[in-house]
Amino acid sequence: MMRVKKTSRKRAASHPSRIPKVELHQHVDGSIPVALAWKLMKRHRLNPVETVIQMEKLLVLQDQERGSLLRYLDKFHYPLWITQFYENIARVVEAIVEEAYQNQVRLLELRYSPVIHTYAGLTLRQTISAALSGINRAKKRFPVQAGLIVIAMRQHGPHIAKILARSAVAEGQQFHERTGVIGFDVAGLERGNSPKLFKEAYSIARIGGLGLTIHAGEDEGPHAIWQAIDDLGVTRIGHGCSSVGDKVLLRRLARDKILVECCITSNYQTGAVKPDRPHPIFTFLEYGIPVAICTDNTTVSGTNQTLENRRLVHKLTVPQLTMIHQNARNYSFIRTD
């Protein structure tokens, strides 16, 4: 259990940038650097506006758009125009890894939904291969551990999720000398798409040796997290904000050492956490629940790992932040053997 206490903002604020960081929850499509997105838009003559400044407003959540997960997810619309081509996918992934490394990220798990990158003719396996290629290019340039988590979108249904799970297993890290797929996730709007619907897909992923995580408790109640734990057997929860309303669930997360991937900036932007409420990460720490400090989408949220850590220094010391990152490394799906 980590005791949360106040510390001097002035003393701590200059140091989080130096912490070696672990990023366990970052989406490819929501993290493409604006300058690169604009360059690729122009190259393919797809730019919907005339200037990069106008483009930035379409890619980055604006103040008046805060408070809605739907408005937040709408920011993924334009990046999909350029990530339908193999080389573009590899290029944006390489750039994302580079940007993370510049923010002292030394272990990075990117996540990505292959289905929504097949509209121009790429197969599922080709879209996965393109993302892995981008990671491998970056790893040649920077000393960083990195891997790919495959996402199934809830709105595509359980059958597509099973197909994706099989494709992810086929590209698993155990079959690659370099980078492979390390995990499986389900994301998208939760309501009407309960975790138990995807039980077969998670069974395929588990048998195939993939790590298991899921987006749960972001726009749905604690029952979604209970299902994810009991029916799917996940070892990590993405967001998990609604669990603070269920003390029994909090104790279960602590007992089973299930890590919560906390995305502070994103959770306030989507309305998962109300503006006047403290972020659940502090409750998780008080209960002894493992956590990871995550960006979710660096471009959409206008954030990075350094900024996320700086948001926490009013209650956590730099040694505590360092310990969180060190412990998060133990929950990574990347194999080191």
Predicted regions: what is each one?
Residues R3-L210, D219-Q227, D231-R236, S242-L259, ...:
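Metal-cofactor-binding active-site regions of metalloenzymes
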